[in-house]
């Protein structure tokens, strides 16, 4: 019993330290880097000079920009042209807010242009991290390659993923995930953030604790993946963990 109690105490301490590290990472000036790039560089340059640089694309009327990330040869970020911190923002469950996941999926073409040939849809993944799983305080969806092992696991579970949010057998990367199948027409009409908030019990009240990802399946449907922060299992809900920014899947 004493050993069990000590182990539990150690886990609590680790969780608290992890939470503290996550908070520290989000309180420094560097956490505003992406926001400053969008609001002080990309957007003004597009409006004044019709040049999106340093972004790859700026769409003021649609409310988003696309930026080449420095990490990895093909990774891009889709971000709003206005202030949204992250998954905790109530704006994301407002139907009038742009459907950023659908927009990010359209922006996958930047990967192919950079690569010099078509990057197949099965190799592409989208991900956004939770409040404690991110390093930046400006909403950004990672557009990048999927890890080969995650691709294989999702392929093997194709028949087990339904149109309801259900636990993905075995989870991913050692963490629990909910999975939901969506069609392209569904995705066009409803944001994954709204699906999560309306369909998973108590999710609306804790949206900031979720990381969310999206991958295309072999039957042309999409699978949405949601993981919730659980510091006792050292899960900071960094959905980006399903991605491989070096794109081994293309080799």
From Swiss-Prot:
Main localization (coarse): membrane
Bilayer-crossing regions: 4-24
EC number of the protein: 3.6.1.26
GO MF assignments: CDP-diacylglycerol diphosphatase activity
Signal peptide range in chain numbering: none
Bilayer topology: Single-pass membrane protein
InterPro entries: CDP-diacylglyc_Pase (IPR003763), CDP-diacylglyc_Pase_proteobac (IPR015993), HIT-like_sf (IPR036265)
UniProt keyword annotations, A-Z: Cell inner membrane, Cell membrane, Hydrolase, Lipid biosynthesis, Lipid metabolism, Membrane, Phospholipid biosynthesis, Phospholipid metabolism, Transmembrane, Transmembrane helix
Catalysed conversion reaction: a CDP-1,2-diacyl-sn-glycerol + H2O = a 1,2-diacyl-sn-glycero-3-phosphate + CMP + 2 H(+)
Superkingdom of origin: Bacteria
Pfam family, one: CDH
Disulfide partners: none
Enzyme class: hydrolase
Pathway annotation from the record: Phospholipid metabolism; CDP-diacylglycerol degradation; phosphatidate from CDP-diacylglycerol: step 1/1
SUPFAM superfamilies per UniProt: HIT-like
GO biological process, one term: CDP-diacylglycerol catabolic process
Subcellular location, record wording: Cell inner membrane
A GO-annotated cellular component: plasma membrane
HAMAP family in alphabetical order: Cdh
Family designation: Belongs to the Cdh family.
Annotated protein name in UniProt: CDP-diacylglycerol pyrophosphatase
Natural source organism: Escherichia coli O9:H4 (strain HS)
